[in-house]
Amino acid sequence: MDTVDFGQVFAFTGVDIFTKEVSVKLYESLTSKDGLDFLAFSFNNRFNHVELLQTDGGPEFKAEFRSSVFKYADRFRVARPYKKNEQSFIESFNRSLRKECLGWSKYKQNDIPSLEKELSDYLMYYHNKRPHMSLNMMTPNQFKENLVSDI
């Protein structure tokens, strides 16, 4: 999990490094309470339970967030500072989010409703239409469907 700064709007992001599924939610602030809300949102709507959850060392992933991590993950890890390789999957997605959807603009809090619509459309595209080389040119949803049918 990570965050992307868009001025007065912050995108909390999460990626499953196996299926390439993502979760994104926009907030007006960058607090551990927001981090906790994003944790619950992501796991209740997308990820269910994982073996390992990794975040950067930001304050949004401390306090209330850390006290709830083990409801959703067996293990928790904080990436080492200045070691971007440890966050390469989420950093790659964050770059795609900027390049393909929200850009490099600085937004105001009152922009959130229109940004949420844009983000919702992008996530539908990302999960259902956008192929990934690491998934053998399948979308995340196609890959997940193939996984289930192979079991």
Whereabouts are the PLM-identified features?
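Short catalytic-loop micro-motif centered on adjacent basic/acidic residues
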Residues: 25, 51-56
